[in-house]
Each structure stands twice: as C-alpha cells, then as structure tokens.
C-alpha cells in the first residue's frame, strides 16, 4: 500500500499517515464501529475497532491500535536496508524499540479503560504498530 506514496510524501509523514492507511484498509462499516482518537480518561487512543453489537454473535475480535512513525534518518538506514531486515531485527533498532515500548505503555492504560467501560463483551486484541519510513511495519501484540 505504501508504494503509492512518493518520496515527496515523506515530508509530511507521521503516525497520522499510518493511521489513515490502516483506516482505509480496515474500514468495514458492516462489522465494526471505527473510533479514531477516542477519549479514554483524558487520553486518546489512535484507533479502536469495536465489533458492532448486532455482530457480536460472530467470533470477531475487537482491536485497539497505537501507531508510531520513525523516519529512515532516525534509524540511520536506507529504504533498501530496511526492506532487507527481518521484523525482529527492525524491532531491536533503538529508535524502533523505544517507540514500541512507548506504544505498549499507552496501550496497557487504554486497554484497562476499555475493559472497565465495556466489561466482558470485548474480545480485545491490542497492537503497537511502528512504521519505519514507508518501507516496513513492525508490530507487537500487548
């Protein structure tokens, strides 16, 4: 999907760009209530995908995602180098690891708030997602 974005698009790249890509690809008005930046005790999760009440009879999962973006310059790698690296190798890069840890900490708080609000009806899966430029995604389940 990122291949449609050009080098000039890097100028405005940030986590909002990544969230919009996910919203575009995952949006399903028939299955999910998509909630971008929902207020959770005065903090804001990036994306919550909550199964619609009338679709709860299916084994669909609810999702909570926190997005981060790190530029190629910040990881001191070229696009070609990043494309050749394994996911675990990318996750170990200091800039990526820091963002994964930050997203993880936020997700734990958001998850607790969502569970306290909705209770046992949620089948919540939580993911921190870091985009390394427009080249690769690194994710971690919480």
Q: What is each PLM-predicted segment?
A:
Residues 1-142:
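Structural signature of nuclease core domains in nucleic-acid processing machines
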């Amino acid at each position: 999907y990122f291949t449609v974005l050009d080098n000039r698009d890097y100028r405005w790249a940030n986590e909002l760009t990544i969230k919009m890509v996910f919203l575009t690809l995952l949006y399903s008005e028939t299955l999910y209530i998509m909630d971008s930046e929902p207020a959770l005790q005065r903090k804001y999760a990036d994306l919550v995908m909550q199964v619609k009440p009338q679709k709860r009879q299916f084994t669909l999962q609810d999702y909570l995602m926190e997005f981060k973006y790190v530029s190629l310059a910040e990881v001191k790698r070229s696009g070609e180098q990043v494309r050749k690296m394994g996911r675990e190798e990318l996750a170990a890069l200091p800039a990526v690891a820091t963002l994964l840890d930050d997203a993880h900490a936020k997700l734990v708080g958001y998850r607790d708030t969502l569970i306290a609000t909705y209770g046992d009806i949620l089948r919540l899966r939580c993911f921190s997602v870091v985009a390394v430029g427009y080249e690769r995604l690194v994710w971690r389940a919480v």
